[in-house]
Design a protein with these regions (language model features):
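Residue-level detector of anion-binding/catalytic polar loops
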Residues: 37-39, 59, 103, 150, ...
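An extracytoplasmic/periplasmic, membrane-proximal ligand-sensing/linker region
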Residues: 73, 99, 121-184
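Ligand-binding pocket segment of bilobal, Venus flytrap-like solute-binding proteins
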Residues: 13-94
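Acidic, amphipathic alpha-helical patches
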Residues: 68, 102, 162
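Hinge/capping helix and adjacent helix->loop/strand transition within the periplasmic-binding protein
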Residues: 1-48, 97-99, 110-143
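Periplasmic-binding protein-like
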Residues: 81-117, 147, 154-155
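Short, structured secondary-structure boundary patches
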Residues: 60-64, 83, 104, 127, ...
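Extracytoplasmic/periplasmic, Sec-exported soluble proteins
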Residues: 18-22, 45, 60, 64, ...
Length: 184
């Protein structure tokens, strides 16, 4: 909340690091939701961006939790918000963006398991069953948690669930990406 107030009082002065189109999209959405403006600073990756954040050269940074988790856990980097709609079980002490004063700023990284078009439905079902079984393994879930990754809800662990999630993400982000002229 204090950061947004500072951004409003100092338009265009906050440096916002983005190392990919998703980060820039989050910055555009942040501006839209808060009525602020930022100076986008492109980086070639999360590592250099985090280093410059730690050194105080930039003001705002959006990265996957896995990239910043070691610094957050060590106390050298402050995580202002988790951009998921709900608190992450991996980092429950980090507030959501809604709780931090920017309702609706939701951007989550995710992974999907894909097969070539035309793959038989039986093969897809077998692959999906193996993936669901693997994701139920407590050891694998712990490894994901150690990396800062949440496992998708069971309803998203199906081809239909992934398709619905993907459609919702496209419907949400495409207008923002198009309006801002963001390129990959």
């Amino acid at each position: 909340k204090g950061l947004v107030a500072w951004m409003k009082a100092n338009p265009g002065k906050a440096t916002f690091v983005n190392q990919n189109a998703a980060g820039q999209t989050a910055g555009v959405m942040l501006q839209q939701l808060t009525g602020t403006s930022v100076l986008f600073v492109p980086y070639k990756g999360a590592g250099p961006a985090i280093q410059d954040m730690l050194a105080g050269h930039v003001d705002l940074l959006v990265v996957q939790a896995a990239a910043a988790l070691p610094q957050v856990r060590a106390g050298t980097l402050k995580a202002s918000a988790n951009m998921s709609p709900a608190r992450s079980p991996v980092v429950p002490g980090i507030p959501t963006s809604d709780e931090a004063g920017v309702p609706g700023l939701h951007l989550t990284g995710w992974f999907g398991l894909w097969a070539p078009k035309g793959t038989p439905k039986e093969a897809i079902a077998k692959l999906n069953a193996a993936m669901v079984a693997a994701l139920a393994d407590p050891g694998l879930r712990q490894k994901f948690s150690d990396l800062g990754l949440d496992v998708a809800s069971r309803d998203q662990q199906t081809p239909e669930g992934l398709a619905a999630f993907l459609k919702a993400e496209i419907d949400k982000w495409w207008p923002i990406i198009k309006a801002a002229g963001i390129k990959a």
